[in-house]
């Protein structure tokens, strides 16, 4: 039956900011849904607070609202836009929860909006643990022994029945937030307390432990005529007990017999029927007890998910796009498969003749004090995917694409160390982020497959594959470089060994191994992902490399080609913003008639969608892989400045190998990144910088520090996201830094900068074409200097800076752009103190603020800069004027501290945010209030506020206190702060610090006395002493600021109503056009 004609407009709910457990896979699914529904002629209205997404670009929908995904705000949008239907299955848990709330509040009924893609009842039945259990029993499927609790008393009763160890999961949360495994009563009570707090329905599911069972997932698509297909089966390499988002996963499932697979296939279809998913994709998770084969259903998600993004990329079957069309009434047999050029219908189940491996990427090094063991609560921040013809090839390709310094199974421990075996055993038993490497180490240390299995519960089939690779490595090392015959090398390359890994094993340089391989004429061939195991020919060029005979890449040569290098797996400091830039480069150059080639290995992103570029190579962004693709494609130009540090690190070597890099030259990039060369340029231009020095030893550092004066910002050169960057307050601190952190940098010195306390930090994005400079936007940070720019909220236009100061910055940016010969994008960071402008740093590449500036001003910076790189001047593009919008846009960040109990949630020079939201308003206050609502800060309008500030902030705290009183807050203060306020005639209630006796701050936070806390500190000891205040504020959901500037901005925002007015991106950009006219 064709599409529904009773609906004309559809509201799509997005997923909001990127958090652990819900990343950019929902930008990929949302963008697909927008495209699919618009090509069917529907009017599409989109709401998503995440500005860094492709789906919130103005061309993607008819009306785009970058507004908080909060039911009251969405009600305003529904009232204004009057959609006929709402599609809630594209935005993860956030969208489902919002849709249920709109239903509950009667908003959908009030405006006559139908829910499509899933019914409220089906969502509830899948998400409500008790209803789900009953439904499974009804169709004869087993679930884990479990019970439901709404308070501690009920929880303990369930535990008595289920026994320890047991698994605790809160309802309606995602990424396993608040859950965990309890081995005893003490742990049980702690996890339950946290879980009850985090579940919106105050409900816990307590399950028997399935630790050590095997875990499988089925990606199922069903239409309203009950056609069901399995897009892909996925097997978890790691056994139950580790969240599937933190597990290494493999597709298709490798260790099921056909009979077991058929049973699971039928069961997953039965689950969709019973839950009532009539249109679209779902994922069903199963667990199998390896001892007796008992099969149970763990859960199902009635929406597209992280796994469906992986399944889409693994098979080439666009689940989100098909699901969107099914939601408006199509059936699977009516839809055609794009990849085979319509030669097969969508009801044709994909079959694949290769193996796909996904490995998660973790960032524990950014969270000192975090528990880095893997449990049922998700902690990874990104993932890499690789495709190979065998499990071994696929696994080794994924390991090198992860960018954690491994080129394959590099050893983690030295076998000479007497503690080696103890350490290996511990790492195998209690899995951390690096367990896969310790498994290889275990085989090196002589453990047997059974021995490793008993500690890890990883299926023996996978272990045998790894053991074989370790034995091969041993023979490579033994034979040396002369033993690498043509035959042996081909064998090794087919097993997925990288040149760099072989080089390490034989003790040679990577270039020598590559030279030898070229001498043998050994190169990879490229196979296509075609959904049908080569049964039909394919129209899309979606490729992966392997060492076989026949190459299917068939490059074309009639159009000029440009290759874009992506950013690899997401991590803190290099996320979706860089993918956004890569996608824009591809889109702009395609519009201009270039053939675009994308190279990336991140399965969550829009850049790895088969129709974003003309040709997609799903490959790791490493020197070896990129050189091979360049060899076969011969592009006119390669863009390295859009994918963050990943491609930039390769720029020099690519250039040396004769690869044509376009845009800013690698040498110019180096001039900005290398401290001494940069200093020369700055001195030549006569610009001001904070007093600084470059040192290579601890003695030098101590000597220079005395001259510069404390506090100092210390950091290694060449890092992204402030890795290993700290503020040190005295010599003891400095010495500790050198002992703990200095090994971060490769032969590079450490930089000391005088720390400008209380300065206002500013980011400027600009584009230079060699003749003129276009200022994209000047963003004023809300948190003062010393907080990493990626963790600070910022405003465009600036909200306190004078026009004169901004003009000084404009002139300096222009001088720097010409001095450094920038071609394309650049980002400059300044600090302003006492009306003086100091230059902090220059990055001649795409910065993470590019999507924000593009949305706020309507100028697609990444597209403009891509055109500059291929030789179109700014004048030819008609892009000469900086745009200062007639409204405020504020970007606020989202931090993952709730996933890492034990970590101090204070902002500092090392970046730790995972995502961001944007708020738009007529005033700064209105925009910031929306950004706060969008980031789910939970700020209340009144109540009791606690002020506890450091010495340097005391002169400004009186003003903040007065503002809060005016807003109707009652005030508490710690001793030093109270004295200052008292002198100004404000008398707060005095509270004890923890060491001053009870009742102290901690008690009062636990009792729920505060709605707001401002706590600023300086100096390592003071920060350590006040850590508990911040941890408790986070745990008890009290909004807190760790900078005074943040406090002032919050006080301003309290005067505004974030649900008062909604404005679409299209209306915002129209205002700019009118203003120009």
Swiss-Prot record:
Q: Where does Mg(2+) 2 bind?
A: 299, 301
**Known SUPFAM superfamilies for this protein?**
Carbamoyl phosphate synthetase, large subunit connection domain (SSF48108), Glutathione synthetase ATP-binding domain-like (SSF56059), Methylglyoxal synthase-like (SSF52335), PreATP-grasp domain (SSF52440)
Cofactor(s) named in the record? Mg(2+); Mn(2+)
Domain called MGS-like: residue spans = 937-1077
Task: Please list where the region (Oligomerization domain) is annotated.
Answer: 404-553
Keywords annotated in UniProt: Amino-acid biosynthesis, Arginine biosynthesis, ATP-binding, Ligase, Magnesium, Manganese, Metal-binding, Nucleotide-binding, Pyrimidine biosynthesis, Repeat
General function of this protein: Large subunit of the glutamine-dependent carbamoyl phosphate synthetase (CPSase). CPSase catalyzes the formation of carbamoyl phosphate from the ammonia moiety of glutamine, carbonate, and phosphate donated by ATP, constituting the first step of 2 biosynthetic pathways, one leading to arginine and/or urea and the other to pyrimidine nucleotides.
Protein name, as recorded: Carbamoyl phosphate synthase large chain
